[in-house]
Every structure is written in structure tokens, then in C-alpha cells.
Amino acid sequence: MPKFEKLTLPNEGEIITFNQGKPNVPNNPIVPFIRGDGTGVDIWPATQIVLDSAIKKSYGDERKINWFKVYAGDEACELYGTYNYLPQDTIEAIKHFGVAIKGPLTTPIGGGIRSLNVALRQIFDLYSCVRPCKYYSGTPSPHKNPQNLDVIVYRENTEDIYMGIEWEAEDNNCLELINHLNNVVIPKSENLKNRSIPDGSGIGIKPVSKSGSQRHIRKAIEHAKRLSGDKRHVTLVHKGNIMKYTEGAFRDWGYELAVNEFREDCITERESWILDNIQKNPEITIENNARKIEPGFDKLTNNKKAFICEEIKEVIASISNSHGDGKWRELILVDDRIADSIFQQIQTRPQEYSILATLNLNGDYVSDAAAAIVGGLGMAPGANIGDNAAIFEATHGTAPKHAGLNKINPGSVILSGVMMLEYFGWDEAANLITNGLSKAIEQKKVTYDLARLMEPKVEPLSCSSFAEEIISNF
């Protein structure tokens, strides 16, 4: 047990342990919580009472969360001193107890940590950010049919541009790097000749690794295995058409993982086309199958034609018995889409998607865009998951002007708590909360952010009253 400088442990409770990335959760886990800055003072108490009430209703005295208050953000500075936004106590507590939940955190002032959220993800190697985007009936939305969108965004959390490896324009290190790239590296790269980085540029590095990509996509596929029907579907979202060696590699490594590690569980989109063509026409030739899966096949070079035909032969030889005759329809479909097109498709063809596996930057964009469709960040939960820790969090900001007014929507943190309960395997309590929240919204008993958008106008509930309304629906 670590020694804490200024923290008080709960009187009882056990530690959550991890085995091969999966949590072993006792009936009385100790769970650190960070209240959060700004409106955290309102939304965390509302969340805690909802979670505790659902657990009590579902399991009686058999299960209980023992809450352990830890500090980050402005509240940490008040206790630990100026600029101490992320105390060592908090780091040690989360490391020891494994799972934590938090409200929104401020952006630190001064040098050092740029983002507390990013710092926590990097410290604990929380490599997958999980953002469900689901519509709750009655929630105001700018879209005609928001109920058609039900996706889970798996955003890689530790690599890509968000690693923060960058240099300011005119910084000496930046100038040295540009000089080296322009005069040494670029001239040696056949595909980059006649290009150069302009003077006065800032430089950011976009690292994307095979190991980082595959461990993240593995989490997405493992999640899909728990789903049923058309929801057993993972889409690799990328800009590989432009960034071939980073975003394109992410796509390729995802397919490689699916067919090598999850062969019995997965079918790629292209493989499904090949097998479907055979099922519809058992006499189809290799060449005609190729014409169906590859537009413009007859205009390709002979080498490319031969490559595609070999691909089809390999699919038939390797999986026609195990995946053919329609059996592939019961498996996880793995496909890919260009990032900019997915922004259109989650609006125009939302039913076609389930789990979106993305790199860091794309995932940030897509998850917020999807949240807007189903009602905004006030109802958008999030989790950051690694192999030895998990942190569940509000996805919105601190909204300091509303702090202490008991008016803000606690839905984001409450639903993040639901994700935590599901992570524990406490599905009965999780379902109780989602059903209670759904009923509250359907009955138009909501906080001001939703009430002001409803027609006809309704009288808003306070933050705490909204929590009580959810509990009353248990």
C-alpha cells in the first residue's frame, strides 16, 4: 500500500487487479474519484448518488463502491500548492487501485503539463479512448433521425500528433530539424524529391506504430465480439489516401490483426464480397469475381490483374469452408473508411456503423461530431482504458461560469459511471441507470441545456433534481 501525503483512505474495500488487460473486480472495490474543476462541484455529487443508489437497488449489501477522494486541477493546487495540478498522491492512488472516475479538469496555467487529461492518459498508458454515441429518446437534436446513430468511437490515445512532439517556429531545435530534413533526409527519399519545408515553419511529429495501432484495434475487435447482429462491425477510420505511412499503415495493420489474430471471428469487407459472389453464383470464375470486387479491373495492368486473382484464390483456399455459404454474416465485419467521408456517413447512413476505430486526432473530431448528433457533450460519456488501469470521465469542459449554481447537466459523468459499471461486469446497475435516465428525458424532466431546446418549452430541473429524477425511475 503506498503512503499518501494528504489523502485519507476509505475504511474498507479491496483493490481491483488486472490479468492480461482485463479487470478482476471485487464486490467492494476502492475507486478513486476526482471531483473536477468548475461544474465538477455540482455534477460529481449528483453522479455519486445515482451510482450508489443503482448499486444498492441492484445488489443490496452484496456490492458497494468505496469512494476514495483524490485531487487534480485547481482543487489540487488549493491543497498541494500553486501549479501542483497533478500531485504524486493522485498518480500513486490511481496506479494502486487501477480504476478511477473524474469530472472535467481545467487547462493548467504556466509551464509543465499542457493538458491534465492527456497527462493522465500518458502516465497510465491508457491507449484506448472509448466514446459511445447513443441517442436517448426525447433528447433535443438538430438532426431529423438522431435515433439512427448508435456508434462507439475507439480513439487511439497515446500516439499521433497528440503526443505533443513539436517545436515552435524559429526555435533553434526546430531550425536544426528543418535544416536536417531539407538537406539530408528529403533528398535521400525518392518519393519526396523537389519538396522542402518552408522557412518559418513550426514542426510537429506524427508517430504511428504497429504495436500501438494493433493493441488499440484489438480492444475494438474484442468489444465487437460482445455485440450481436449488425453491431458486430469494426470500421478502421483513416486518411491513408494521403498519409500512407501513418494513417495508411494504421489501416493495414488493422486488417493484418483481424485476419491473423481473430481469423475465426472476423471477415474483412473485401473477403465478404468475394464469398458473397460465390454464394450467389457458385460457377463464377476467378476473373468475373475480380470484376465485381475491383472497379475497372479490365483496364488494370496484367500484373495488377494477376495480383487480384491470386488474392481471390487465397481467400477461397483459406476461408471458404469456415466462412463461406453465408457463415461470414455471423462474424465481425472489419472494413475501412476515409476519415472525411465518415463525417458524412454518420449523418447520412448512420445505421451502417457500429464501432469506429481511429487514430488520435481523427477520433477527437469524430467523437465530438457524433456526440452533437445525439444531443451534445452534456450527454457524452468517455473512458480511457489500458492494460493495467482505466479512467472514466466527463467529455465536456469545466464551464466555470455555471459552477456552484446546481444547474449543469450531470449526464456525461453519470453515463461515464455507467461505462465503469459495465467495465466491472455490474450490468444490472448500469442498465438501471440508463433506463432511469431515458425515462427522465422522455418525460421532459431535464436540466436547462436540454429544456431550452424542447418544444414546447419545459421548466428545467436542477442538477441534483435531475439525479433524483433518474433514481425515482429505478
Mark where each language-model region is.
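Glycine-rich phosphate/diphosphate-binding loop of Rossmann-like nucleotide-binding domains
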Residues: 26-27, 32-34, 38-48, 181-337
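Buried hydrophobic positions in well-ordered alpha/beta secondary-structure cores of metabolic enzymes
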Residues: 37-40, 98, 154, 220, ...
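Glycine-rich phosphate-binding loop
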Residues: 93-106, 266, 281-388
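Glycine-rich phosphate/nucleotide-binding loop
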Residues: 2-11, 76-78, 328-329, 343-445
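N-terminal glycine-rich phosphate/adenylate-binding segment common to multiple enzyme folds
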Residues: 75-191, 202-203, 360-365
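Structural/interface elements that position substrates and couple domains in central-metabolism enzymes
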Residues: 12, 32, 53-54, 58-59, ...
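Generic secondary-structure signature for well-ordered alpha-helical cores
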Residues: 52, 56, 60, 96-99, ...
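N-terminal phosphate-binding or glycine-rich loops at protein starts, especially the Walker A/P-loop
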Residues: 7-65
